[in-house]
């Protein structure tokens, strides 16, 4: 029995198929990866967060996009659909169709069991190469927890010596408030998780900080 032959597509072929497909798929290195459906809890958390961002940023020059807008990571050729995107400069798109954003400022992912490893690892490693990106937030759907990575100023005498550092702040508990300083806004976890129910209550709250250097512990390729 012969092994099943993989079919590889060019980015142009992927986009042609994607724009007429009934479901969304991601693209990387010639391969297409169908996206799984989301749980009601995942959808509610993403909706709450989007609504909160839209209201908070209403009078500011920032736009909030849902998971229907693709993002392209130009350095690697990854096409993906973050759960929530914030763009605060004039949007730059991959082509005149204006359905693939190149310059997100903030990317937010609501974690799912099937995507958490990739969102924390390979996908974040690629997101970090987007020059416009300043903030990356991971929102748990299993407990009240928001992990917020913030790009720090590069250090080094030359571009070759510079190291991009990302500061992690973890907000846990419904009485905590996530702060996105680059946007000048606060996101109360009680509003992010409004009407979200868990089998067991999560007690306590805390804020943790740790610095990670670019490239550490992110080796898995996106799937």
What residues fall within each predicted segment?
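Gly/Pro/Ser/Thr-rich low-complexity, intrinsically disordered segments predominantly at protein N-termini
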Residues: 1-223
